């Protein structure tokens, strides 16, 4: 699985200018996602962040490869949790048409924001838990606020819990949980086709909780609530 590395976002079944690029499966040679450039980076005592652009490229065109989608990732890591065995970062992605042609993401069982666990996490050395309390055998294609993957490396457990923002398309999003491979993805296209058009980019936000041991559901629920409805301050004139 050449395409399953770390954290990534790609779609499987798409329609673009009469072709069907598969941006997920790199080995088919018909499409790919590539880094395009760095737009911004900053850091301070509260958070550090960077912004990058990625191109979703159709390789099966009659002429030269053609960029179908421009995707901007804003990644922000928060200075919290280190003394309690966890860290926290957010990814906000904006996916826009690269030109006048729309892209239709077709109904599919997987494809979207994804995460792959360590090679050592195959089989019983990997566990899943969702916000609905589902484990690996029952979680696949259920709709969730968050999903956690954890595994054992040299006898030590650790994991990541990914939280979907309530403003995301089709929230609570379905989640694809693989029966044997240590990966999962949020897959809004499981509920049917959707379009990305020149005048309407797709904006998605996720929070990543990186933790020692297995996830504590109460802690994940609290952090999801903080993500979904952060505290707000208002200045009121007397």
Enumerate the language-model features and the residues they cover.
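A short, structured loop/turn motif at beta-sheet edges
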Residues: 38-48, 81-85, 152-157, 167-169, ...
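Residue-level recognition of well-ordered beta-strand positions that form the cores
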Residues: 51-55, 72-74, 92-96, 114-116, ...
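N-terminal small-residue-enriched
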Residues: 1-18, 115, 196, 205-206, ...
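Extended, loop-rich substrate-binding clefts of extracytoplasmic carbohydrate-active enzymes
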Residues: 2-85
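Short coil/turn motifs at secondary-structure junctions
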Residues: 59, 98, 211-213
